[in-house]
Amino acid sequence: MNLKVLGATGIQVSELAIGTWKYHGGVEPLQVGIEGGATFIDTAESYGTEQTVGEAILGIRSRVFVASKVSPRHFRYNDVIRAAECSLRQLKTDYLDLYQLHWPNYTVALAETMAAMERLADEGKIRFIGLSNFSVAEMKRAQGCLSRVRVVSNQVKYSLVCRDPEDGLLDYCKANRVSLLAFSPLATGPGVLARADGGDVLGQVAAEVGKTRAQVALNWCVARPEVIAIFKADRAEHVRENCAASGWYLSSEQLARLSRGVKLVQNRSAIEQFGRRVARRLVQYAGRSLGNPTAMDVEGRTSVSDTRPGAPGSR
């Protein structure tokens, strides 16, 4: 498994991370992934999977890089603190490696939220601060609210069929030493990739390098040094397949051929598509208790797992 430096932290993490959005595989596939080198695990308070992740990393905490997210309905200062502490209990750990704002919340001052994040960092409860589904402008605002630490990552949708980050976000991340964490690197499964790849360029390249189509698609995604791809798989065999997408390199010609040959079928920014919907829902969910922070999905995302149970897919 290839390693990459996360943002400007100097810390190396696996270039393929295991995602747990709508994950139902239990402990074993996560542990298989860790053994396969995917020691970066991503979860969130709204996923309902933090407890499973905590069980999977029990006794091996120092070997893994654990990321979680605070939901936008918990962006008030005290709510951020309580949400983080709840995640720590669920994960059975005393610190998070990366804590991310899951979506922008336009009803709470960003400075208030970031002040709480900075306090968590000062107290050692989180090591690094990240964002998710933030635009370039929102990233700049978030960083401007921090006085002592830096934003190290932004998690957004990115794949062969959804390349919105190439319209400025990737360039900004590269210039500012921010890692782009790509969710849905396999789109919504092989069916979507097949429809976008009418000439079967993926199949041709896969045959050339002796890999599967999914492995080629993942390898294309992490070819950029600033990108880390987050895959999801409920079955151990699919986790192994995804982990084998790292440790080798496509040629520049193969990368270009894939970019030309696979058409874009999801070309609306996830931020543009869901941002306003999320903002409207925040008021509805604002009064919910932190006692059950994983009970609902406030992000409005659809499942991106393969139609086959546990197939190699992404968050």
Please annotate each region the language model reported.
Residues 3, 104-315:
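Beta/alpha (TIM)-barrel catalytic core signal, keyed to glycine-rich beta->alpha loops juxtaposed to Asp/Glu
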Residues 11-16, 37-40, 61-64, 93-97, ...:
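Short, well-ordered coil/turn segments that N-cap beta-strands
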Residues 91-107:
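Active-site groove signature of glycoside hydrolases
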Residues 24-33, 76-91, 139:
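Short, acidic/polar
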Residues 23-26, 42-52, 73-78, 106-109, ...:
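Acidic-and-aromatic substrate-binding clefts and catalytic sites of carbohydrate-active enzymes
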Residues 7-8, 54-62, 85-92, 121, ...:
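Acidic (Asp/Glu)-rich catalytic clusters
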Residues 1-64, 94, 284-285, 295-313:
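N-terminal binding-site loop/beta-alpha segment at the start of enzyme catalytic domains
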Residues 63-75, 98-102, 156-157:
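A short, structured active-site edge motif that brings together acidic residues
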